Amino acid sequence: MKYAEMGNIQSGLKFKSPIGLLVETTGTTQHVASHNVYVHEVVVVEGVGRGERFLLNLDYAQAL
């Protein structure tokens, strides 16, 4: 799936980030005009950094 082309995403989807964090989408999306891609806000749901939010290109994450 090409998440970088999606202007919005459902909240609550779980992914494993490229560095191994278990994250969940919040439903917030931001367009990066310089690269013409969308990134999606995720929150760490367990382990180190739990509760922290960051933007992630979900094309590089593993859907769970």
Task: Label every model-predicted segment.
Residues 42-44:
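SH3/SH3-like beta-barrel fold
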Residues 18-20, 47:
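Short, surface-exposed secondary-structure boundary micro-motifs
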Residues 32-37, 48-50:
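Short, solvent-exposed loop/turn segments that connect beta-strands within catalytic domains
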Residues 48-64:
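Intrinsically disordered, low-complexity, charged/polar segments
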Residues 20-32:
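Short beta-strand-centered aromatic/proline hotspots
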